[in-house]
Amino acid sequence: MSEPVNKVKQTQQQVDDVTNTMHIAVGKMLDNQQKVSELTDKSENMKQGAQQFKKKTNEIKRLMWCRNIKLTLIIIAVVVLLLVVIIVPIVLKFT
């Protein structure tokens, strides 16, 4: 009669072990879900930051391009003006 009682106790111990293991596994799963949720939020924030960064860099790129064109036009105008100032008196002198 002792043997069936031992088997019941042994089976109950196995059930308790499995239950404990499942509790631990469920706890870890919930922790992992929380971490995934946090990572998803951080990822979304980074995505928004990257989009804002890209928008700003495009604005700055456009602004710098305009400034570069203006500077180039000013340099060309100064060179043309200098050439006119130098060449016109020479041409007028020889005509």
Swiss-Prot record:
GO terms for molecular function: SNAP receptor activity; syntaxin binding. The keyword Transmembrane helix applies. SUPFAM superfamilies: SNARE fusion complex. Induction: Regulated by the srfA transcription factor. Residues 92-95 are vesicular. Pfam families: Synaptobrevin. GO terms for cellular component: plasma membrane; SNARE complex; transport vesicle membrane. InterPro entries: Synaptobrevin-like (IPR001388), Synaptobrevin/VAMP (IPR016444), V_SNARE_CC (IPR042855). Residues 7-67 form the v-SNARE coiled-coil homology domain. The chain crosses the membrane at residues 71-91. PANTHER family: SYNAPTOBREVIN FAMILY MEMBER (PTHR45701). Belongs to the synaptobrevin family. Involved in the targeting and/or fusion of transport vesicles to their target membrane. This is Synaptobrevin-A. It comes from Dictyostelium discoideum (Social amoeba).
